[in-house]
Amino acid sequence: MRTGEIKALSGLRIVAAVWVVLFHFRPLLEQAAPGFRSALAPVLDCGAQGVDLFFILSGFVLTWNYLDRMGDSFSLRSTLHFLWLRLSRVWPVYLVTMHLAALWIIFTLNVGHVPSEAAGSLTAMNYVRQFLLVQLWFAPYFDGTSWDGPAWSISAEWLAYLLFGALVLVIFRIARATRARGLFFLAVAASLPPVVLLMATGLFYTPWSWLPRIIMQFTAGALVCAAVRKLDPSDRARMGAGIASLLLAATIVGILYWLDAHPVPTIYDSAGLVDVLFVPLVSTLAIGAGTLPAMLSLRPMVYLGHISFSLYMVHELVHTTWNWMVLQFELQLGSDLAGKALLLALFAIAVAGAVLLYHLVEEPARKWMRSMMKPPRDTRQDSGHGRLQTIDGQREDRRSVVSARAG
């Protein structure tokens, strides 16, 4: 049974999170650091693709940790236990940022002359939907579904978690009958529907486009994980995979710059085409050594990967607060030294908020929620067929597994 943290993928999480953060902070970068914004425009303008990378990572990580324990046969108790463990990962930070966002909207209604545009969404039904993580399920577009903007992807992730109990049964049987190479090609194929829709419409953001994004990217992550689990690469092969991951990352960046200079006339969001390279990137990082995998596996990168979910959830609150202050107090973010210092301060506040959320909310609440459930008994463990057969027979902390969240 393969479990344990793949550090390079933990490090990849912070890369994806920062990609999304910079995407949302583009207007601020344009004002305070126009040269930086212009130089990195092809990469920053498609930062929303970081969410697709998160979806693939989530499917990979859950399959990495649960394929053997949930794939052989269905167990309602094990599935419910799994879902509670998933909630313990995402719900605490999600609920805190959700309520902070709601309180901020109320604050703007009572202080100053610039009420939040989201004030009309403060309804009882909207609260219940967001509390239960189902707000996105009723909307064709994710904009405006959540008081804390990035929370839409957590609602999408929750749908994937609910489907995982059935998906893992299918993946287990496909993996049993398919070689690693076949599983890899299936994973690439599973990641294609959002790209095909993009090519058909020219837009990445269309009605209900979030649904194939989460379902198919999550499934692609699960399939490529099943492929990786079958591999036993030599040291030389691992080094080769590491070099391949570096080349893939460079290729993704190169394609983004090429598409920026030579846009496809019929595809407005042509940068979304790079999604087809995410599955190969994740797979090579998972088995690779040296170069890019080694850099992403450094302790600071792994720690930042651990707090990436909190950063993902809190950064838009900082951004929204600043936008309100600009209108309320008629502030301007200049390109001088003071403007750059203020921009760095906003980033620092977001990171500090993420650190506080991780240490004061995310980890303590996760452990508290886990303590409420007894692990499901698995007789296979008693019979000696595996040393880790129950869902929480593996100690699911930061030292032993990769976190599986869209953030």
Describe the role of every protein-language-model region.
Residues 1-196, 214, 295, 302, ...:
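Membrane-cytosol interface segments of multi-pass membrane proteins
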Residues 48, 214, 218, 222-223, ...:
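Alpha-helical transmembrane segments of multi-pass integral membrane proteins
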Residues 72, 230-231:
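Perimembrane helix-loop-helix junctions
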Residues 105, 192-199, 251-259:
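Membrane-embedded alpha-helical segments in integral membrane proteins
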Residues 143-148, 199-209, 258-268:
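Membrane-interface helix caps and helix-loop-helix hairpins in membrane proteins
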Residues 151-154, 208, 239:
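Short, amphipathic, aromatic/basic-enriched membrane-interface segments that mark the entry/exit
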Residues 182-185, 238-243:
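The cytoplasmic-loop to transmembrane-helix boundary for the fourth helix
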Residues 204-229:
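Acidic, glycine-rich loop-and-beta core segments that form the ion-binding/anion-interacting portion
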